[in-house]
From Swiss-Prot:
Recorded superkingdom: Eukaryota
Residue spans of biased composition, Basic and acidic residues class: 27-37, 85-102, 178-205, 212-222
Tissue: Widely expressed: expressed in most organs, except small intestine.
SUPFAM superfamilies, A to Z: GTPase activation domain, GAP
Domain Rho-GAP: 324-523
Listed name of the protein: Rho GTPase-activating protein 18
The gene coding this protein: Arhgap18
Bias kind Polar residues: ranges: 38-51
UniProt GO molecular function: GTPase activator activity
Pfam family, one: Ubiquitin_RHG40_C
Amino acid sequence: MNWLSSSSGVVLTAYHPSGKDQVAGDSHVKGGDEATSSRRYGQYTINQEGSTKVPERPPFDRSSSQDSLDESMEAYWTELENIKRSNENRQEGQEAIVVKEPDEGELEEEWLKEAGLSNLFGESIDDPQESILFLSTLTRTQAAAVQKRVETVSQTLRKKNKQHHIRDVRDIFAQQREAQEKPPDDSDLRSVRTNENKGQGKDDQPSSGAVDSKEQISRVPEDTPASETDINLEVSFAEQAVNQKEFSKERTQKISSNDSLPSFRLPKDKTGTTRIGDLAPQDMKKVCSLSLIELTALYDVLGLEFKQQKAVKIKTRDSGLFGIPLTILLEQDQRKVPGTRIPLIFQKLISRIEEGSLETEGLLRIPGAAMRIKNLCQELEAKFYEGTFNWESVKQHDAASLLKLFLRELPQPLLSMEYLKAFQAVQNLPTRKEQLQALNLLVILLPDANRDTLKALLEFLQRVIDNKEKNKMTAGNVAMVMAPNLFMCHTLGLKSSEQREFEMAAGTANVMHLLIRYQKILWTIPKFIVIQVRKQNIENQKKERKAMKKLLKKMAYDREKHEKQDKTANGADVPQGVIRVQAPHLSKVSMAIQLTEELKASDVLARFLSQESGVAQTLKKGEVFLYEIGGNIGERCLDDDTHMKDLYQLNPNAEWVIKSKPV
């Protein structure tokens, strides 16, 4: 279904989520209106001409106890003025992104494809078994989100008399429910739903696939409320939101911009915390599909609209530094420095800023001269890859301006076109915890290049904030200065009313603040999603084994005999309660280790590294890691605090290998 060809296009020069009121800006206003006009022009009408005067911005009603985020909105408006002046010299060659307005049902169809559920509609509906297996691993709220969108697509296809086999959505979800209600065999990993498997108990021995559900979720007694600052990664965020609604008829009051940000923490998980970059690509793909479904379910539960947005392909330069898609830029860089994950120019600009001391007052806030920035851009384009550019000539504030310009001139936003609206909508979630949960899922959904670059940016911004006593750049200041550079792109946007413009300013600054403050938490993959990935892997393995048995039915006897021999050999090699750890690149390539309650991944690494000699002795902690490979996971890098016995019970068929992380 190609809806792009049949829809009318809208050319956007800046991006705004839902504002429809159009107010023309005035670039020639004098006196008291001048600052207001230029600020408005800077954000929403960068490429517009022929503007008219608008009323002066209404005063902002500020409370007496403003927190750091709202110290001075003037920093935000000043940054927009600086952006406007910078763009006046860099209009040439810019092309607006064309965003097509989708037909009814098209967004839902794209969503199902992104979620890996295209088998639920269209020509492949005749064999939906794979999707039904996927659905059987979903939580109640996730399944509801999927069903809602399948129904919309089915209704739309019927209306349009498409020549597809339109299966009744009730049939699909009836099969899904049957799959969930079937008694699990010993190799099944139980669902992580909060309303399932209560009171079930098994012995302490691990099954062939996983441990029983009480090992999957550490339940908090109903009469013991969880700490408001604890982030529960073991239960679906959407399910938590439902439980919160049921627990209290009155939802937590909507947060205001002057609420201080709490110090959230992640309780220790004995099976180890999983971070982005720890999983194999095939498992990470499943994580992204589940994160999209979970994010949508969370927005559905909280009554917010979740819509992805696609941009039509536009012409972009295929070489250079500024205005180049991240993927193309990284391809260029990797020819120079193999394994590069963050653009070299971006890294160099950050390095140049830090060389001038992060204690410089007004760092990031004070702009470089617009004409000088333009000349530096041209010189960088010509000399950067040749290695002849003179970095000593770049002043610190100029480097900061170039860094922000790089972000603004990306053909598509660093936060991605698909999810920019969802990032902006985070400000509308009722509680800080739910805002954090949504941001966590959104970060997971970003393309690798965008996510890696965002991480480098946030880490740099935190280093700037760490020097706030000297540079006067608090977290609130930095958030307000950087928000328009991330949430406003020179190719996106709509003119809006002043009230809407002000709400967007405060809201995006708030989201920027959350990204900086909670960046360490945001790069964590929730445990309930990892558990669902394990469950999917088990279901897929069962399906593959079933297919294999049909193909090799005549060889069943020989295979069973061989498996028994292998099992006997393995049992003799590794006694009960012992794991064998492989280290193919170290001098001691294998070691049998007795499992104890206290044994952690860091202890296993320490035992191997302590026995290294010669050249291998130079290996340090952080250069090699212990991996869980196979069983019900593809591959997972373990954090130091992983309790090995607990993880062994969760995945008894895994292999344990010490190796370095892939570049």
